[in-house]
């Protein structure tokens, strides 16, 4: 509707994207009848049907259970590979950021600012490998611990400065 396309073409694109996100046959199901993971996939398909150059995902997987989250992470990587779209993912999950990002930016709090940037190989590895294996990769574990320690130390510094006020 937004682009005033032919309704038949639009319906075909809807079916294609629902199939890609694993929801073939759910096109006429009301959203409220879908599980949380299915609703997230509908939201992703709804975004992608408009063929944006950039996809902004703000905490898209935070409310999902562990299994559904892992499936959605694989789906995001698959869509990234197949479409070549730029995806900006905002998340509080260090592990998720490491798995899905080519670049990771750690923000420092109060005031919010860029603290450190990382270039990562794990998303590319995830295109061909098992995400669970990547999570156990020694480089992945090391990077996760480095970032978590950095964040922990920043939080401690803030708490100490608040105590001394």
What feature does the model see in each segment?
Residues 44:
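Hydrophobic anchor residue at the start of the ABC signature
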Residues 69-83:
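Helical segment within the ABC ATPase nucleotide-binding domain
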Residues 85-90:
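Conserved H-loop
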Residues 109-142:
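Conserved beta-strand-loop-alpha-helix hinge in the C-terminal portion
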